[in-house]
Amino acid sequence: MSTALLDAVVKKNRVRLIPFMLALYVLAFLDRSNIGFAKQTYQIDTGLSNEAYALGAGIFFVVYAFLGVPANLLMRKLGARTWIGTTTLLWGFLSAAMAWADTEAKFLIVRTLLRAAEAGFFPGMIYLTSQWFPQRNRASIMGLFYMGAPLALTLGSPLSGALLEMHGFMGHPGWFWMFVIEGLLAVGAGVFTFFWLDDTPEQARFLSKQEKTLLINQLASEEQQKVTSRLSDALRNGRVWQLAIIYLTIQVAVYGLIFFLPTQVAALLGTKVGFTASVVTAIPWVAALFGTWLIPRYSDKTGERRNVAALTLLAAGIGIGLSGLLSPVMAIVALCVAAIGFIAVQPVFWTMPTQLLSGTALAAGIGFVNLFGAVGGFIAPILRVKAETLFASDAAGLLTLAAVAVIGSLIIFTLRVNRTVAQTDVAHH
């Protein structure tokens, strides 16, 4: 009876929270990656150099690295609704402000402020998931959330491409309208957050008293099985550092490809970045949608975290590397494999810290791991450009990213993860 009721509660939470979280992630990812679509014409119009573009794409992550931990602790203190709603409003306005960043200095300043506003969003979403869903459901729940990335790049690619075609409307370039319109969408979502989100299950307006009690008791029982709830213990735990390094390698693969993908696809097609290239750019993200649905569900069903994550990241590395060596059609196929790999690995990966940590340690630990991811995002475009310049080859940059992803997969294989927890949970499903 309690198992059936708990499943019903999880379903209610999923219906209430996942579409909301997914929509926010779509907007966040779109605002974060739309600079890739603007790159070609934006650089021509503003005179922005390749080095400044790479620095701007990378510096976006520096502030994030420093603010991730305190942002998550602030969310724990202030409440999810206030924190997520406020930060979403801020990043929406700042994303729109990119439309007026027509010099290198303005570009770097706005990108830095935008990342500061976004710093608490993603780790906050991971923490929010741990407060609303039992351990046995988290990979598939995170998989649904992570579909926001391929959705943003599937729907957002044609959207961004179409907005770029507005060049000349009211005397402004296409990238101006892309930044303004996509930024204001996030502003609207921030306002909606204040009316929709509850801070904790105890405050949930859509759950009965019995449902709240059952969920709270289930989550409390899982907390008792975790290694630590203190931040100091978390930072002394070797597995936390392993997770942080792994996440760095994942983000190198992700952002080393995403920031340059529209340009890479346009080069494969022999055209400029516009609507046609943007539609083709969406193909890998359509593939990633299916992978992000299936792979985390398989992980939840089997209770297998480590091997699923390692093999998925390995596939991403192989796909990235081959995309620079094959014919245009096969290169698109390789990019599909890469996108499936580096998107689908992340929801499986994030079950590991939520299985290991609890309380304040979990909030700060997620921020700590995400800090390393921010470092990965910072160095990724710089690493790719440096490799391309050093070897005078676009393929060299892709092979460098691939090598980092393969190293990450090998580290995952060495990680000790308590598979029994997931298996036990599945057995009770």
UniProtKB/Swiss-Prot annotation:
It is a multi-pass membrane protein. SUPFAM superfamilies: MFS general substrate transporter. It comes from the Bacteria. One of its GO terms (molecular function) is transmembrane transporter activity. It is found in: Cell inner membrane. Residues 38-54, 103-143, 196-242, 296-324, 383-394 are periplasmic. InterPro entries: MFS, MFS_dom, MFS_trans_sf. Keywords: Cell inner membrane, Cell membrane, Membrane, Transmembrane, Transmembrane helix, Transport. One of its GO terms (cellular component) is plasma membrane. Pfam families: MFS_1. Residues 1-16, 76-81, 165-174, 264-274, 346-361, 416-429 are cytoplasmic. The keyword Aminoacyl-tRNA synthetase does not apply. The chain crosses the membrane at residues 17-37, 55-75, 82-102, 144-164, 175-195, 243-263, 275-295, 325-345, 362-382, 395-415. Part of the rhmRDTA operon involved in L-rhamnonate utilization. Belongs to the major facilitator superfamily. Phthalate permease family. This is Inner membrane transport protein RhmT.
